[in-house]
Amino acid sequence: QLLVMKVFGASQDSASEAVLLAALEDAILLGADVINLSLGMAVGFSSGGYAYTQAIENAAEAGIVVCAAAGNDTSSTVGNAGGTDLGTTSNIDIGAVSDPSSLTQVMSIASVNNNWVLAQGFFTSPSDGEPLFIPVSDSGAQFGHQSFETLAGRDNEEKGGYEYVVVPGVGRSEDFSRVDAMGRIALIWRGDIAFSEKCDNAFAAGAIAVIVCNTESEFVTMDLSGTQVDNSLPCVMISQEDGQVLVEEAGEDGMGALTVSAQWQTVQAEDGGQLSSFSSWGGLPDLTLKPDLAAVGGNVYSTMDGGAYGTMSGTSMAAPQASGMAALLLQHLRETYEMTGPEARERVQPLLMNTAAPVLQSDGVEYSPRKQGAGL
C-alpha cells in the first residue's frame, strides 16, 4: 500500500523542515519499506542539519530505503542569478545535486527522457504534402490556464483551423508591436524573459493561445505562476525542431495555419533514452560521487491536481520509479533469501547500481557518472 505524506501546503512552494521531519517519523512508525522524496534544494552536502540527517539515519536503521530526486538545476552555473551563493563559471565545482538526495544514506536519482510520449498536439496545414502531427507539453493546465485541447471544440476549428503568427524576438511587448496577434495563436521562442511574461504579453496583444518553442529538443515544465489573474490563455511548449518546422511553413509573412487535435497521440520522443538536460550534475563539494542512479523522469504521463492527467518532466518523476524498483527488490530479497531489515536495505543500492545500464549520448559516448550515476 501507499502512504501519502502531504508536506506542501495548498499555496506553498516549499516545505518546512519540521513538516518533513514529522512525515519521515510517521513513515518510520508506520513501517514503510521505501520512502520517496520528490523534493530538494540545490547544491547539497553529504551531511545535512543534525535533525534531518538523524531522521534519515533512523529510517536506514529501520531497514527503509530512501530515494530522492537529484534535482532539476543542471549545474550551479546554469541560470545562476547573482546573490544565490552558487558557484560561478570559473569554479571547477559545478555540482548542483539537491539535498536530501546528497545525503549518504539516500539514493540520488537522475532523470532520463522517456522513449515515447503520450501527447496532445496539433497538425500542421502545409500548402503541399501531408499534415505533420506536432506534440505539445501543456504546462499551463497546472497553473490555472485553459487546456490546449479546448481549442479543438471552438468555432475556429470547425472552420478549418487556426492561424498562428511567428512573434519576432522572445515575446517582449515590443516584439508583439511588430506583428498582428489579435485572434491568432502566438508562436514565441524561449529565452531571456520568464514564460509568464511571454504569456501575459500575448494576452495583452489579443492572442488566443501561446506556443513556446524550446531551444532544445526536449520539453520542460514551464512555470506560469506569475501570469496575470485574468490571463487563462492555453500556453504550451513544443520542441526546437518542431518550432523550426512551423517557422519555415509560416514563410516570409510569418503566418501559418494549424489544426488542434482532440485525440492524444503516442509519438516517439526525439530525445528519448537520453539524460534530461535539466537533471542536476554532481558530485558533491567533498568529492562524493552523486547522483547514484538514473530513472525515467522526462516526459512522464501521470496524475496531476484536480483529478487530471498530464505529461511532466523532472527528477521528481524519476525518483518514484527508483523507489518502486527498490520495493520490488526488497520483496525479492525477503521471499527468496528471507532477508529483511537493515541487511536487506544495504543490499538494494549496490544491486541496483551494479545492474544499471550506462546511458549513451547520441554520439555513442557514455554520459559522465557525474550526470547519470551508475546508469539507468
Model-inferred region functions:
Residues 285-289, 356-376:
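Zinc-dependent metallohydrolase catalytic domains
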